[in-house]
């Protein structure tokens, strides 16, 4: 009787292991396939366009986009695409970008590109526009100067929000919400509520 119980338990365990879903590595392709329950239209992550609702979370999560600043593991603000910032006065912020940052298509991520990205953000994302209260942005080489309509002591924190992923707006946004960013991956295909394909950023 004891042997039969042991055999039944072993069979049940084997079936459980067999049914467990695990990440798969496709043979000879170096392809990692995994599921994500948050990347869907219901969660307002229909694509990876950071200017679209909360899709900035997907843009940053999958390594396509990067923000000017980010939070460290200890929740401290640290540079990312940007190198440093200066709070010139209560309405003026000067941000210096890191040298040599490029988008995945090879375009330089300079002050003008960042200006375009932020202007597109506040034009298309109501939440970002309300948070940032940007009045004007000026670009000069590798720096941008932001003027706000009211004092914004937390401006750098807001620029660290995933909606602040810097994208190449000159390259445009595809109909299915694919953008060009500065991250380690490039999106090649996206179908909302189904899949997102990524390849290594060669730039």
Q: What are the roles of these predicted feature ranges?
A:
Residues 35-88, 180:
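N-terminal lobe/hinge region of extracytoplasmic solute-binding protein
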Residues 19-29:
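Sec-dependent signal peptide cleavage junction
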Residues 29-40, 92-95, 114-117, 144-146, ...:
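Short, well-ordered beta-strand elements
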Residues 1-8:
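Bacterial N-terminal signal peptides that target proteins for export
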Residues 178-203:
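Bilobed "Venus flytrap"/periplasmic-binding protein-like clamshell domains
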Residues 86, 94, 129-170, 184, ...:
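Surface-exposed binding/hinge segments that line
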Residues 83-125:
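Aromatic- and charge-enriched surface segment that lines or borders ligand/interaction sites
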Residues 11, 15-19:
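Hydrophobic core
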């Amino acid at each position: 009787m004891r042997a039969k119980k042991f055999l039944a338990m072993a069979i049940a365990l084997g079936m459980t292991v067999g049914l467990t879903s695990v990440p798969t590595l496709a043979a000879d392709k170096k392809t990692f396939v995994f599921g994500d329950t948050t990347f869907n239209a219901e969660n307002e992550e229909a694509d990876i366009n950071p200017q679209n609702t909360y899709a900035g979370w997907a843009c940053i999560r999958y390594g396509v986009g990067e923000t000017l600043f980010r939070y460290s593991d200890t929740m401290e603000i640290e540079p990312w695409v940007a190198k440093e910032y200066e709070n010139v006065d209560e309405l003026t912020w000067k941000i210096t970008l890191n040298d040599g940052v490029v988008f995945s298509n090879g375009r330089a991520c300079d002050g003008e590109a960042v200006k375009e990205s932020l202007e597109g953000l506040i034009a298309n994302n109501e939440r970002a526009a309300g948070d940032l209260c940007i009045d004007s942005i000026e670009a000069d080489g590798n720096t941008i100067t932001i003027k706000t309509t009211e004092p914004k002591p937390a401006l750098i924190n807001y620029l660290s929000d995933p909606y602040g992923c810097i994208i190449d707006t000159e390259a445009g946004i595809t109909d299915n919400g694919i953008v060009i960013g500065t991250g380690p991956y490039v999106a090649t295909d996206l179908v909302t509520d189904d899949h997102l394909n990524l390849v290594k950023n060669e730039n």
